[in-house]
A protein has these predicted regions:
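Phosphate/pyrophosphate-binding active-site segments
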Residues: 11-102
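Thiamine diphosphate
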Residues: 102-173
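Glycine/threonine-rich flexible loop motifs
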Residues: 4-12
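Short glycine-rich anion-binding loops that position phosphate/pyrophosphate groups of nucleotides
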Residues: 1-5, 25, 99-101, 150
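Short, acidic/turn-prone active-site loops that include or flank metal/cofactor-
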Residues: 2, 23-27, 43-46, 120-125, ...
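Structural motif corresponding to alpha-helix initiation and N-cap regions
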Residues: 6, 78, 153-156
Length: 173
């Protein structure tokens, strides 16, 4: 598939000796023409028996890994997002910024009910986030948002809008 927007992941992938592209849109996917091999689709594989505990084992391992990672950190972006998401009152809106915040929420926050979660997606997902947050706050008694510092700067002029009293924005640097 298409390369990611993450520089660190792309740099890591560039270290591999071989690159395999599996996608029918080759001309738009392997733009650097560096693929070692190109496939238009994955081969169809027949599985004769399924391990019935595989999914539950994977889920339990994931929970354990998340616990171990967060236990070793006294304060970090992950702990901050975990703390913020756990403290949201029911019935509130929660906007999660692109890039690190949304990845950390997915990886480290505990699922909850009674919270409406929102996110933007654009070319890089950071344009117009404050304006979106202000719009969301018009429909909820309490609105909370977590965004990165660059996301904040990309929509700084939105702060010219009238004051919103039911909104708390956390900016992660």
């Amino acid at each position: 598939g298409r390369t990611t927007l993450s520089r660190s992941i792309n740099s890591y992938l560039a270290l591999s000796g071989k690159t395999y592209v599996i996608d029918p849109r080759i001309s738009t996917i392997d733009t650097k023409r560096t693929a070692s091999q190109i496939f238009f689709a994955l081969p169809k594989l027949e599985v004769s028996t399924l391990n019935p505990t595989w999914i539950s084992d994977w889920y339990e391992t994931s929970k354990l890994a998340s616990k171990v990672i967060t236990e070793d950190q006294s304060w970090s972006e992950q702990v901050a997002l975990q703390t913020i998401s756990a403290g949201l009152p029911k019935g509130s809106a929660f906007f999660v910024g692109s890039s690190r915040p949304i990845r950390d929420i997915e990886a480290f926050a505990t699922s909850r009910s009674g919270i409406e979660v929102f996110a933007n997606r654009g070319l890089a997902g950071i344009d117009g986030n404050l304006s979106t947050i202000f719009g969301i706050s018009n429909s909820f008694e309490h609105t909370y948002a977590v965004i990165g510092d660059l996301t904040f700067l990309h929509d700084l002029t939105a702060l010219l809008a009238p004051t919103v009293n039911n909104l708390t924005v956390f900016i992660i640097d």
